[in-house]
């Protein structure tokens, strides 16, 4: 059994909390894409664990965790995150963590060129805006992967005669091509090389053939949960390109990032924030550049876990959610942070786009169009009630249930979980048929 948790908007929907809720039922949690450019916090017994690259399944002492071939790995950050989690009391994490031998490596010079590229792009753009990269080197690493010049985990840990020398030569060549492109930026190659010589020995025990790992688990009928990174609207193909990440963050990325066939997928859980946020630049049709946006930002504590950047806030965009549903095929939804809307008397939701008076049939691929659309809103009544202490779905205010029902009816997917507060137990389950 393979079930998948995916973000349906622009990220930061609260995927980690749902994964945390579910991991007790699973034998394996796997990540399939991205790197340490995303982040979420899980609270267990009053202890906060910040995850960026590593799977959230580490909070379950009986769960194995895999970084698949689609993930890009900055090895120093891998160990730093692991050590930070261990220092907070995470038990036997090292024996439960595995890394695909096919995953690509992120080097520090990828991070340097990430920022240089961002400056270059902002200088070229008409409005001076940049993509809003986290600066973690993710984009440049996927770029070297696509150009077939990147280095993978197996290149680093290979013990065969001459393998280390080949790694050094390829590493140096990769650095030189970056310097040819971006100038002679500061980078101590010899010091980094010495660091990686130590790290390769530390990394070896974690490395597995992830294809064999996954297929053996599937054959053994293990329960597997795939933890998606980022979200559909940041997908390299289906997101608001070019204001996207560099990987496939939808259901397609699950298959290619773990090497599993489509028929192995059972349930696909779409995580949806009860309003909409995004970090960085790019079109955002329902954004509220007013007191409503500020109120959502303040009550929702909308700051990025990885970057600390303030998130842009707006009303729930059902055009986005319907588009996301078409691509990912969600079998049920998790609506998060519903409590943030508690004090709003009226709650608009975006239900259609039009441009120059003409209604659009679907979410547009052209950002020149998307940036000019007018949003039609359906205004729903608020519930003006604190829902953070409610423990059963049935006890939610009627208007809160109507809000959720409107979402269900619009996208044609049932709501199965509802987040009503930051605590681990603040997640209501709704039976679905």
Swiss-Prot record:
Binding-site positions, Mg(2+): 12, 39
Binding residue positions for IMP: 12-15, 37-40, 134, 148, 230, 245, 309
Active site: 12, 40
Regulation: Inhibited by GMP. Inhibited by chloride. Inhibited in a highly specific manner by the binding of a 44-base DNA oligonucleotide carrying the ARS core consensus sequence.
Cofactor descriptive note: Binds 1 Mg(2+) ion per subunit.
Enzyme type, top EC level: ligase
Pathway, per record: Purine metabolism; AMP biosynthesis via de novo pathway; AMP from IMP: step 1/2
Keyword line: Cytoplasm, GTP-binding, Ligase, Magnesium, Metal-binding, Nucleotide-binding, Purine biosynthesis
EC number: 6.3.4.4
Subcellular localization: Cytoplasm
Temperature-activity profile: Optimum temperature is 35 degrees Celsius.
Alphabetical list of SUPFAM superfamilies matching this protein: P-loop containing nucleoside triphosphate hydrolases (SSF52540)
GO cellular component, one term: cytoplasm
Residues the record lists as binding GTP: 11-17, 39-41, 311, 337-339, 419-421
Gene3D superfamilies: Adenylosuccinate Synthetase, subunit A, domain 1, Adenylosuccinate Synthetase, subunit A, domain 2, Adenylosuccinate Synthetase, subunit A, domain 3
Pfam family, one: Adenylsucc_synt
Record-level Gene Ontology MF annotations: adenylosuccinate synthase activity; DNA replication origin binding; GTP binding; magnesium ion binding
InterPro entries named in the record: Adenylosuccin_syn_GTP-bd (IPR018220), Adenylosuccin_syn_Lys_AS (IPR033128), Adenylosuccinate_synth_dom1 (IPR042109), Adenylosuccinate_synth_dom2 (IPR042110), Adenylosuccinate_synth_dom3 (IPR042111), Adenylosuccinate_synthetase (IPR001114), P-loop_NTPase (IPR027417)
GO biological process, one term: purine nucleotide biosynthetic process
Other facts noted in the record for this chain: Present with 56800 molecules/cell in log phase SD medium.
Subunit: Homodimer.
PANTHER family for this protein: ADENYLOSUCCINATE SYNTHETASE (PTHR11846:SF0)
Function recorded in the entry: Plays an important role in the de novo pathway and in the salvage pathway of purine nucleotide biosynthesis. Catalyzes the first committed step in the biosynthesis of AMP from IMP.
HAMAP family hit by this protein: Adenylosucc_synth
Protein family per UniProt: Belongs to the adenylosuccinate synthetase family.
Protein known as: Adenylosuccinate synthetase
Organism, as annotated: Saccharomyces cerevisiae (strain ATCC 204508 / S288c)
């Amino acid at each position: 059994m393979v079930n998948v948790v995916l973000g349906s908007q622009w990220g930061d929907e609260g995927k980690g909390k749902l994964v945390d809720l579910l991991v007790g039922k699973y034998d394996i949690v796997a990540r399939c894409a991205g790197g340490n450019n995303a982040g979420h916090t899980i609270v267990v017994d009053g202890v906060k664990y910040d995850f960026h690259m590593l799977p959230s399944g580490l909070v379950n002492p009986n769960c194995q965790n895999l970084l698949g071939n689609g993930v890009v790995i900055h090895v120093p950050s891998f160990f730093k995150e692991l050590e930070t989690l261990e220092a907070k009391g995470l038990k036997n994490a090292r024996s439960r963590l595995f890394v695909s031998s096919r995953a690509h490596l992120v080097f520090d010079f990828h991070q340097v060129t990430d920022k240089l590229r961002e400056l270059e792009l902002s200088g070229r753009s008409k409005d001076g805006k940049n993509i809003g990269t986290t600066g973690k080197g993710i984009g440049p690493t996927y770029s070297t992967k696509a150009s077939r010049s990147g280095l993978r985990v197996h290149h680093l840990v290979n013990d065969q005669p001459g393998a280390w020398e080949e790694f050094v030569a390829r590493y140096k060549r990769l650095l030189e091509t970056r310097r040819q492109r971006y100038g002679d930026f500061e980078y101590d190659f010899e010091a980094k090389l010495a660091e990686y010589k130590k790290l390769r020995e530390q990394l070896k025990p974690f490395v597995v053939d992830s294809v064999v790992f996954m297929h053996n688990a599937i054959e053994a009928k293990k329960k597997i949960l795939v933890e998606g990174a980022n979200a559909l609207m940041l997908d390299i193909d289906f997101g608001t390109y070019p204001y996207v990440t560099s990987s496939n963050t939808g259901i397609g990325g699950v298959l290619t990032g773990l090497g599993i066939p489509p028929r192995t997928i059972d349930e696909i859980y779409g995580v949806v924030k009860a309003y909409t946020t995004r970090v960085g630049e790019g079109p955002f049709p329902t954004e509220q550049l007013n007191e409503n946006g500020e109120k959502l930002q303040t009550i929702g504590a909308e700051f990025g876990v990885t970057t600390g950047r303030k998130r842009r806030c707006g009303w729930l965009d059902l055009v986005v959610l319907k588009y996301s549903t078409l691509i990912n095929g969600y079998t049920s939804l998790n609506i998060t942070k519903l409590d943030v809307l508690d004090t709003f008397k009226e709650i608009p939701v975006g239900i259609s786009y039009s441009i120059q008076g003409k209604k659009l049939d679907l979410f547009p691929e052209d950002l020149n169009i998307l940036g000019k659309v007018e949003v039609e809103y359906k205004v729903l009544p608020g519930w003006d009630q604190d829902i953070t202490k409610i423990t059963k779905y049935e006890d939610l205010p009627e208007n809160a249930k109507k809000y959720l029902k409107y979402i269900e009816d619009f996208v044609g997917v049932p709501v199965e979980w509802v987040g009503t507060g930051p605590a681990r137990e603040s997640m209501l389950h709704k039976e679905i048929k």
